Amino acid sequence: MNKLRTSKYLQVIPREKDYAIYHSLFGNLCLLDFDGYNLLRVFDKACSSNEVLKSFSKYDPILLIHFINTLLSKGFLTIDGFDEYVLIEEDYQRCKKHFHSGYLIRALQLVMTNKCNRSCEYCFVKTMYNSDERAILEQSPKNVNMSFETASIAVERLIEILRKNGNRELYIEFFGGEPLLNWQVIKSVLETFKNQANGVTLHYSITTNGSLMIPEMADIFKKYNVTVTMSIDPLDLKEQTACRKGNGRLAQVIRILKEAGNWVTFNSVISEETMDEFDGYTLVEKAKDYNVTMIGLILDLDLAFYGSDNKREAALQKLWETYSFGRQKGIAVVGYWYQIFQQIIGKQATRFSSGYKTCPATGCKLSIEPEGHVFICKCCSTYIGHITDLDMVLHSPQYEAYALKAYYNAPECKGCEVEGFCSGVCMGALEKKYNKIDTIESGTCTIYKKITRKLIENIRTHEILTLPLVQHERKQLHVCG
């Protein structure tokens, strides 16, 4: 009989009344009572199930074997001498030859315009880029507004790629600048492709400051099920404006969208510029007032922010306060930082089905500039081609480097407690600071690991699988008389 041992990827977080355990590559978070945890630790030294049955003779052997098999199926136990990382390597070797087919792609980001009618101090575009191509395009008068022709080519090419790879869903994001400045092209895309095109289901979203919203837009968004994400500037939440220098009232914009029946979410940023004024309690209260049930919290994309212990702790505190208060009020507070936890508990598909962990800039999304130039994301600096030659884009070494990150993190990530679920910090931020993506920013890693641990420590027992060994004790027969 093969001997079993605890996986070297086993992660254990002691809690007040139980232990939270998960696999750092595959997740499967569950809770063990004290007896179950003690049994698990017997396998720290390789042994067979029969040996354990003898040591735990007070338990029903059938239930005990079932318990051990459950630990084995979730990866907490493994055959002695087997390294589970080989499964990732096998998956990579099987899939890498298909990178150039575009099989990873699930999303298309259309940069409708590089203009904006606001001047938010924390906007990443002002300081994000470090490539000559980005510098040229940011100044090019031809790269201001996307034409319907360019948008149409991008959508058609991506639909073709998805169909060839057997994928049937494409997520299209209207982005900017302020995308509503190019409303007519957005409207034309929606009315041309609708929610189904050539057998591919199209899901739409838009990120906007909302200041230009009118009922016609809200009605069109509702018709085509466009998720509307409102960028909320924390500095002006109390005044209920959509952006610092805006004159559009947040309440008015939300009312227009809600009257049309739209799904609305909020986005806000915790950054160097917003840290002092960020008020998660007010943000959640406003969401509650306007019947907005989801808030996306984005952490600063300037890596210099994470060099200070005090700033990291302050950001973590604001993140946790907002998340906790959101739970109290029935508001989901999410972000890339939250996706790590979601994957560990099995509530969100991992890269084996979705193609990425926390960041879609791993070959899973293409961002198209107004003139048709292709980047992996609006945040990234590396130029990878033009939408009219998508085959060249997908065969470029630049695209392959991003796609590799869907499987492998930087060498420094090996052995990390969230290795299988974190893509590291924003690829664009790494390019800006280090001019490469195969590296880490330790300050950001600290925040991701701490918030993940805190989320696990505070998960409620009814929200996750519990494996109680104490209930498996052999029942004794009591004879009266």
Cite the ranges covered by each PLM segment.
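Acidic, low-complexity/disordered tracts enriched in E/D and polar residues
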Residues: M1-V42, H478
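Short, small/polar residue-rich loop motifs at catalytic or cofactor-binding pockets
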Residues: E16, C359-G363
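Long, charge-rich, low-complexity alpha-helical segments
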Residues: L31-Q109, E149
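Canonical Radical SAM [4Fe-4S] cluster-binding loop centered on the CxxxCxxC motif
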Residues: G102-E149
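Radical SAM/AdoMet-radical enzyme domain recognition
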Residues: F148-F175, N182-D302, G307
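Short Fe-S-cluster ligation motifs
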Residues: I153-E173, I440-G481
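C-terminal accessory region of radical SAM enzymes
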Residues: A315-Q348, V374-S423
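Cysteine-cluster motifs in flexible loop/terminal segments that predominantly coordinate metals
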Residues: Y407-K454
